[in-house]
């Protein structure tokens, strides 16, 4: 009985995350500004991490946790890089000095 309820809840959460992913991808494509696209990319990566986490629970394995961590690291680095590019027009300084 409990296993059936748990399975139904996991499948319904996958459906809800799938709908959220479709909405995020639509906003990522149609975003009016670059800042909207950056925020949407960050949200999309969070939804993908959630989907992978739910799939990990569904399959009963912890081997997907490494991929969740990799997605989080790539999302963080890309968000910071794009934000720096939007803010100043460059990602890295050529003279190795900080912008103050």
Curated annotation (Swiss-Prot):
The chain crosses the membrane at residues 5-25, 38-60, 70-92. One of its GO terms (cellular component) is plasma membrane. It is found in: Cell membrane. It is a multi-pass membrane protein. Keywords: Antiport, Cell membrane, Ion transport, Membrane, Transmembrane, Transmembrane helix, Transport. One of its GO terms (molecular function) is sodium:proton antiporter activity. Belongs to the CPA3 antiporters (TC 2.A.63) subunit F family. May form a heterooligomeric complex that consists of seven subunits: mnhA2, mnhB2, mnhC2, mnhD2, mnhE2, mnhF2 and mnhG2. Expression of the mnh2 operon in E.coli is not able to catalyze Na(+)Li(+)/H(+) antiport. It does however confer higher growth rates than the control strain at up to pH 9.5. The operon may encode an NADH-ubiquinone oxidoreductase. This is Putative antiporter subunit mnhF2. It comes from Staphylococcus aureus.
């Amino acid at each position: 009985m409990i296993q059936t309820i748990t399975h139904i809840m996991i499948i319904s959460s996958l459906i809800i995350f799938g709908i959220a992913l479709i909405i995020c991808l639509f906003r990522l494509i149609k975003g009016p500004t670059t800042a909207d696209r950056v925020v949407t990319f960050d949200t999309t990566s969070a939804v993908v991490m959630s989907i992978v986490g739910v799939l990990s629970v569904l399959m009963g394995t912890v081997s997907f946790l490494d991929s969740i961590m990799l997605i989080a690291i790539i999302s963080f680095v890309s968000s910071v890089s794009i934000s720096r590019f939007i803010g100043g027009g460059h990602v890295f300084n050529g003279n190795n000095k900080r912008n103050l």
